[in-house]
């Protein structure tokens, strides 16, 4: 009797697996379909965007400039590559953080929408003739402690993020705007 129950369970399991697999395999077939199957072109289409200027590593901002503007000692550049940099106090994740990001072929509107959903305010801004947004984040104990500036360059944009974790601190938006100005001046 025990073998019969086990055999029945295995048969049921096999039937269930077949019920799942058969529709999946059938979905891969175009049998009975009146739709023609298109070919994939091997020639590249005109999918390249219109890129803005080139930005040097870290937006052209040195570690010394970051320390001077933020008034934070012991800043360490913990992430540095061709599209962004991040500075942390003492290299740790607890404390103030500052970052530069360069988004090639990415819509600034999506980033702005994210900011609108998560920040206290988001406004239009123009820096050196380039438009974008400025987003302010605040915390009850700190006030306005975070500022992000995103500036569009055709199909690209850059973003500076400045965030403090304890008082006193200089104006996050003053710093973010100055870093953005300097990065624009450093672009080619």
UniProtKB/Swiss-Prot annotation:
Q: Which of UniProt's keywords are assigned here? A: Cell membrane, Lipoprotein, Membrane, Palmitate, Signal
Claim: NAD is one of the keywords in the record: no
Q: Where is the lipid attached (N-palmitoyl cysteine)?
A: 28
Q: Which PROSITE patterns match?
A: PROKAR_LIPOPROTEIN (PS51257)
Positions where lipid (S-diacylglycerol cysteine) attaches: 28
Does this UniProt record's set of keywords contain Protease? no
| Protein known as | Putative lipoprotein LprB
Give the source species.
Mycobacterium leprae (strain TN)
């Amino acid at each position: 009797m025990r073998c019969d129950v086990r055999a029945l369970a295995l048969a049921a399991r096999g039937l269930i697996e077949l019920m799942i697999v058969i529709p999946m395999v059938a979905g891969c077939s175009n049998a009975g379909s009146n739709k023609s199957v298109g070919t994939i072109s091997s020639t590249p289409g005109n999918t390249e965007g219109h890129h803005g200027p080139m930005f040097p590593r870290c937006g052209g901002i040195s570690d010394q400039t970051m320390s001077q503007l933020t008034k934070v000692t012991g800043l360490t550049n913990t992430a540095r590559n061709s599209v962004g940099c991040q500075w942390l106090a003492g290299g740790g994740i607890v404390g103030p953080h500052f970052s530069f990001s360069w988004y090639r072929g990415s819509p600034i509107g999506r980033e702005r929408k994210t900011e609108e959903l998560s920040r206290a305010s988001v406004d239009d801004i123009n820096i050196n003739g380039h438009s974008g947004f400025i987003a302010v984040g605040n915390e009850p104990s700190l006030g306005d402690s975070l500022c992000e500036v995103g500036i569009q360059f055709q199909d690209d944009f850059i973003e500076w993020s400045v965030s403090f974790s304890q008082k006193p601190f200089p104006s996050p938006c003053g710093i973010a705007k100055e870093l953005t100005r300097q990065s624009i001046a450093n672009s080619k």
